[in-house]
């Protein structure tokens, strides 16, 4: 998992409340047995004018020119600005996978669905909760100025606007540690690899029958 320390990126405003995970990555794409390739289908039913299917070549599909991520001014955005209750609905982990693979490092909103919020941290996407007043202001700024960028300093727990205004946000110490060090669940486990190996070796000595292979 990629480390998250300080990130500066273009902001894309998604001005919709209660965006559920089926909107983020529609159900038909969950058939895949891989963890990759979901970025092209992020917000599939909003980005495209036709119905998408797994394995389809998205480069030939008709796009919805009115959808925010299809507008040239937001091309390459790495920060998604959203409204309240973002990520509600089913608990599919494919939702943060799709956001990450599209290129979003962070999502800023007044509130998130609990499971989606947790899944973001496990997959390298930083979900940031700001007040509705602060989010309203950022929407106004993003829409008023082309190329509007924000800087996110995870160590300082601040979102910094171009004029220097800093918005503080909360993050649990353990989740912050994992993102700063690029540690997912597997990475955390591997930090204790020596202890795991030592335990397994000791267990075999005490319970040798565990190592017996049946014919």
Swiss-Prot record:
Its EC number is 4.2.1.33. One of its GO terms (cellular component) is 3-isopropylmalate dehydratase complex. Coiled coil: none annotated. The keyword Amino-acid biosynthesis applies. It is an enzyme of class 4 (lyase). It catalyses: (2R,3S)-3-isopropylmalate = (2S)-2-isopropylmalate. InterPro entries: 3-IsopropMal_deHydase_ssu, Aconitase/3IPM_dehydase_swvl, AconitaseA/IPMdHydase_ssu_swvl, IPMI_Swivel, LeuD. GO terms for molecular function: 3-isopropylmalate dehydratase activity. GO terms for biological process: L-leucine biosynthetic process. Keywords: Amino-acid biosynthesis, Branched-chain amino acid biosynthesis, Leucine biosynthesis, Lyase. The keyword Amino-acid biosynthesis applies. Pathway: Amino-acid biosynthesis; L-leucine biosynthesis; L-leucine from 3-methyl-2-oxobutanoate: step 2/4. It holds the Pfam family Aconitase_C. Catalyzes the isomerization between 2-isopropylmalate and 3-isopropylmalate, via the formation of 2-isopropylmaleate. Belongs to the LeuD family. LeuD type 1 subfamily. Heterodimer of LeuC and LeuD. This is 3-isopropylmalate dehydratase small subunit. It comes from Polynucleobacter necessarius subsp. necessarius (strain STIR1). The gene is leuD.
């Amino acid at each position: 998992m990629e480390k998250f320390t300080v990130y500066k990126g273009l902001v894309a405003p998604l001005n919709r409340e209660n965006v559920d995970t089926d909107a983020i990555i529609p159900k038909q794409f969950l058939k895949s047995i891989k963890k990759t390739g979901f970025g092209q289908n992020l917000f599939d039913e909003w980005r495209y004018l036709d119905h998408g299917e797994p394995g389809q070549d998205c480069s030939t599909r008709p796009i919805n020119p009115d959808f925010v991520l299809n507008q040239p001014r937001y091309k390459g955005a790495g920060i998604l600005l959203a409204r309240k209750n973002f990520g509600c609905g089913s608990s599919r982990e494919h939702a943060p996978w799709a956001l990450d693979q599209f290129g979003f490092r962070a999502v800023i909103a007044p509130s998130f669905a609990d499971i989606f919020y947790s899944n973001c941290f496990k997959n390298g996407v930083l979900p940031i909760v700001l007040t509705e007043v602060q989010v309203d202001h950022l929407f106004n700024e993003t829409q008023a100025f082309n190329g509007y960028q924000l800087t996110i300093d995870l160590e300082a727990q601040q979102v910094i606007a171009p004029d220097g205004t800093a918005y503080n946000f909360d993050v649990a110490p353990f989740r912050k540690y994992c993102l700063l060090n690029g540690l997912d669940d597997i990475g955390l486990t591997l930090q204790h690899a020596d202890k795991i190996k030592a335990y397994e070796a000791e267990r075999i000595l005490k319970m040798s029958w565990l190592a017996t292979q049946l014919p």
